[in-house]
């Protein structure tokens, strides 16, 4: 087996953390966090800080595992190494049938939302959603190479609107007094209900902070992984937290707490801020950058989604492994990708039902799909405590225990924000996992039979 060259240093590793995590989540979550905080900007800022602290603790805990097994490249590998193939299969099944398809659908909707605003369209968000949904899957199935190049090109663009709105908004807000007003006056149109509070707001930030685990995939390619990886994860995460909090304060300089809540769950708050700060033309330029950021995140998630079933099947477990390990001439796992399309349509339907009042409440699948993945993270933390006896006590016990508490706090916050919707979502997930468990079975994988993979 070929071993990748040791070619990446501290800066590249840190930049990868920033590039993967920063995306559309922070633009969408602005109003959501204020709403979940009960309209209190100070509580919302604290939520952003605590949410960032959670990913800093989580990334450090995972760096411990990554340095022990540099051949592994993600949560499924880590779980398989210490909890066996079946548990890893179940985690992979969750990622393929819940995590990826949920987020692909929602990101398609967000792209439709910002496009509708940019062009001043009415009632176009769902047709645009479908257009983006079909287009991004088609790109990844027909031309995966172009999809990969697209992902790299959008990384830098993601930072530009964040920095511009943060800087200009802070200056304007301090001069006009809006920032101080936002910090001192609670919003009056909160819709979060009895679940509003710090824990619920922290859970909402999980959507904006998601993706950090993917940065561990380059561990074996770092020049001095033991020194570089923990530092890169820490400083990269700290940079993200600082940018997010400054961006959030920048928004408060031109968008009131009440306005942010009215536009909760969409990108409208960020677009409004851009127009007020830079005028219609330059505001639209910033909005285009936000759209590019959304599409970059959507493309990255879709790249994972179309390969998810292949990653399950190639390990030799689950249904029709030979079927799902077949690759097209362009090396795209088309059959697994088409299954991903079908599953994403289902979850997009759940998201659509939120706006039609089908569920009697809002099932925030964007947050819940991420929060539920932290259950799998806890398995990794348990493994550190049980098996990493060569570590000093603070690493073997302190770090994983703190990371476990952080994960449980996120889960608690998601539950308290909307208990009934949490239960509905959990019910759907358990059914999906139950189906996966019924279909689990050791079969010969493509690797075992020498098929192309």
Predicted feature locations:
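Select transmembrane alpha-helical segments in multipass membrane proteins
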Residues: 7-17, 43, 84-97, 129-132, ...
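Hydrophobic transmembrane alpha-helices that form the core helical bundles
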Residues: 57-133, 137-141, 146, 291-308, ...
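Helix-loop-helix connectors at the membrane interface of multi-pass transporters/channels
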Residues: 76-86, 108-129, 161, 219-225, ...
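Helix-loop-helix junctions that connect adjacent transmembrane segments
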Residues: 2-6, 120-124, 153-287, 419-421
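A generic transmembrane alpha-helix motif of multi-pass inner-membrane proteins
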Residues: 369-373, 379-382, 386, 393-453
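Membrane-interface "cap" regions at the ends of multi-pass membrane proteins
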Residues: 1-42, 55-56, 60, 71, ...
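TM-loop-TM module centered on a large, flexible mid-protein loop between adjacent transmembrane helices
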Residues: 77-80, 84, 117, 237-299, ...
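Membrane-interface loop-to-helix entry segments
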Residues: 112, 125-178, 233-238, 372-375, ...
């Amino acid at each position: 087996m070929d071993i990748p060259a040791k070619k990446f240093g501290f800066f590249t590793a840190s930049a990868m953390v920033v590039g993967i995590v920063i995306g559309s989540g922070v633009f969408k979550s602005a109003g959501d966090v204020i709403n979940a905080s009960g309209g209190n900007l100070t509580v919302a800022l604290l939520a952003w800080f605590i949410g960032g602290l959670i990913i800093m603790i989580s990334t450090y805990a995972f760096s411990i595992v990554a340095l022990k097994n540099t051949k592994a490249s993600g949560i499924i590998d880590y779980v398989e190494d210490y909890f066996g193939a079946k548990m890893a299969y179940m985690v992979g099944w969750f990622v393929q049938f819940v995590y990826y398809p949920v987020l692909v659908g929602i990101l398609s909707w967000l792209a439709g939302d910002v496009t509708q605003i940019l062009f001043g369209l009415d009632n176009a968000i769902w047709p645009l959603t479908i257009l983006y949904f079909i287009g991004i899957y088609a790109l990844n199935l027909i031309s995966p190479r172009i999809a990969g190049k697209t992902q790299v090109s959008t990384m830098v663009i993601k930072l530009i609107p964040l920095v511009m709105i943060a800087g200009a908004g802070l200056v304007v807000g301090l001069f006009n007094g809006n920032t101080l007003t936002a910090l001192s006056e609670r919003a009056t149109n909160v819709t979060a209900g009895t679940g509003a509070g710090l824990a619920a707001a922290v859970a909402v930030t999980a959507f904006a902070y998601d993706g950090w685990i993917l940065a561990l995939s380059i561990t074996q390619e770092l020049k001095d992984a033991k020194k570089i990886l923990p530092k890169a994860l820490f400083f990269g995460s700290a940079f993200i937290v600082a940018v997010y909090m400054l961006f959030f304060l920048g928004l408060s300089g031109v968008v009131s707490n009440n306005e942010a809540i009215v536009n909760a769950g969409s990108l409208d708050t960020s677009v409004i801020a851009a127009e007020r700060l830079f005028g219609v033309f330059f505001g639209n330029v910033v909005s285009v950058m936000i759209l590019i950021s959304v599409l970059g995140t959507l493309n990255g998630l879709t790249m994972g989604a179309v390969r998810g079933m292949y990653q399950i099947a190639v390990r030799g477990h689950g249904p029709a492994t030979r079927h799902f390990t077949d690759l097209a001439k362009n090396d795209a796992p088309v059959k697994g990708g088409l299954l991903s399309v079908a599953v994403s349509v289902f979850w997009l339907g759940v998201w659509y039902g939120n706006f039609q009042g089908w569920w009697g409440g809002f099932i925030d699948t964007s947050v819940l799909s991420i929060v539920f993945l932290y259950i799998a993270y806890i398995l990794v933390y348990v493994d550190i405590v049980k098996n990493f006896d060569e570590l000093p006590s603070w690493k073997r016990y302190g770090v994983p225990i703190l990371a476990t508490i952080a994960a449980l706090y996120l889960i608690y916050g998601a539950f308290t924000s909307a208990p009934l919707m949490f239960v509905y979502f959990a019910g759907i997930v358990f059914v999906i996992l139950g189906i996966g468990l019924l279909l689990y079975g050791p079969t010969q994988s493509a690797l075992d039979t020498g098929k192309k993979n």
